Design a protein with these regions (language model features):
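Signal peptide processing junction and immediate N-terminal pro/mature segment
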Residues: 15-22
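A post-motif C-terminal structural segment
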Residues: 22-26, 43-48, 57-63, 67-104, ...
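A short, compositionally biased domain-edge/stem linker segment
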Residues: 27-41
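Active-site-adjacent structural elements in enzyme catalytic domains
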Residues: 45-66, 121-135
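Structural motif
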Residues: 52, 142, 322-324
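A glycine- and small-residue-enriched flexible loop/hinge segment at structural boundaries
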Residues: 98-120
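Extracytoplasmic mature domains of secreted/periplasmic and thylakoid-lumen proteins
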Residues: 114-170, 176
Length: 412
């Protein structure tokens, strides 16, 4: 294969993985969709928006997971969505973004430097989640790593470096996001508690309760009638294995709370609409390790969460679902499988065996896919910059506009 030889000569680290991995791939949880494209929803404006972000998810990752799960002619749930686009991901100071700058772009509508969250080097900017809350919409963040990690932080915090996770935890509570599910309990515990990552004695879990949050460590404790819920299911990143809740289960629970029409006394509530961000956080982790089987599993877990969003949107008729990524990780490619023995010309070999190659263990500058379904989906076709996403969402939801600097703030 000439491209492999050329890549090796250029000094690229090429790692080839076969679909016949040494570890069995457990995807028994995956429920594949039908093959028909979802029908368009005629409403022009959504009442609700669910944004799914697959961390590190490029087209190579999506295609590889599809082939392993449902075959080359099948479709994932996200691939059933009728509107597609391509998203450019560069940051202000690099052709290759990180999750902090990418989240800031998708939340605040600005390009910023890598590692910076919710601001540029000079000043902070409001996120679409903050603007939605000001407009009266309900808001939520659901992730499988720490809730203080770069992607969720980009939607509700403003710090000079993504590693300031103890500060981010304080800002998340101050932002009063209605529903927050994920890991990261260590950043909310006072320093004298085993496992705490804090250097002070602030008990943010107690502060959350005093602020009106119901704190849970198990989804069985979540009721739709709750107004504000903080669920931390691991000290740092979740394992994404039972007994922890799956991303799909957390997504369903978050939607249930955000869309609830009754309080816990059975009294009716107005349904102002909601904006929810759901991240498949650990696709990226697997790609950094070039671990193909883990990547496939994480992407399919993410796709099951997308399924939950699609099923709600199909019944609701007023919900826009977007699926995209912050960046691609690993430079994953699908390449020709080795030629059969005795074959003179490998180009003539017809094989459906999956063979993949990683080009690195870091982020890349590849554009990433975007899939859209629901009212307003047609605004997300074509080639978009990642800063275009919040700008168009602001128009659809009647909030914003972005970018919008924070005039007075106590953030650091």
């Amino acid at each position: 294969m000439l491209w492999l030889a050329a890549a090796l000569c250029a000094g690229l680290a090429i790692q080839v993985w076969s679909a016949q991995a040494t570890e069995p791939l457990d995807i028994g949880f995956y429920q594949p969709p039908g093959q028909l494209v979802l029908p368009a929803i005629p409403a022009e404006r959504p009442r609700n928006v669910v944004v799914f972000i697959g961390d590190g998810m490029g087209l190579g990752q999506v295609s590889t997971a599809r082939i392993r799960a449902v075959g080359p002619d099948g479709r994932l749930w996200m691939e059933r969505m009728p509107v597609t686009g391509i998203v450019l991901t560069h940051s202000a100071n690099s052709l290759v973004t990180d999750s902090a700058a990418a989240a800031t772009a998708m939340a605040c509508g600005i390009k910023t430097d890598n590692n910076i969250i919710g601001r540029d080097p000079n000043k902070p900017y409001r996120s679409i989640l903050e603007l939605a809350r000001q407009r009266g919409l309900r808001t939520g963040l659901v992730v499988t790593k720490s809730i203080t990690d770069a992607t969720p932080a980009g939607f509700a915090a403003h710090v000079r470096h993504r590693d300031m996770q103890t500060v981010i935890a304080v800002q998340l509570l101050a932002s009063r996001v209605d529903v927050m599910f994920g890991g990261g309990k260590a950043y909310f515990l006072p320093r004298d508690v085993t496992g705490s990552k804090r250097r002070d004695r602030r008990d943010l879990l107690e502060q959350a309760r005093q602020a009106g949050y119901q704190y849970v460590e198990d989804l069985s404790g979540v009721k739709d009638c709750y107004h504000m819920v903080l669920g931390l299911f691991a000290m740092e990143a979740m394992t994404t294995m039972p007994p922890e809740p799956s991303l799909a289960e957390m997504t369903k629970a978050a939607i249930g709370v955000l869309d609830s029409a009754k309080d816990c006394n059975g009294l009716g509530l107005a349904k102002p609409g909601f904006l929810l961000m759901v991240e498949g956080s650990q696709i990226d982790t697997a790609c950094h390790s070039n671990h193909l089987e883990t990547m496939i599993r994480q992407l399919l877990l993410f796709d099951m969460a997308v399924k939950a969003g699609i099923e709600f949107a199909s019944k609701d008729g007023q919900t826009l679902v977007l699926v995209t990524a912050d960046h691609e990780t690993g430079g994953l490619q699908i390449v020709p499988a080795p030629a059969a023995k005795g074959t003179k010309d490998e180009d003539e070999v017809q094989t459906r065996q999956l063979q993949t190659a990683w080009t690195n263990k870091v982020h890349t500058g590849q554009p990433v896919p975007l899939y859209a379904y629901g009212p307003g989906a047609l605004l997300f076709t074509g080639v978009l910059d990642n800063t275009d996403i919040p700008k168009r969402l602001c128009g659809l939801l009647g909030i914003g506009p972005v970018p919008q600097p924070v005039e007075q703030t106590t953030v650091r």
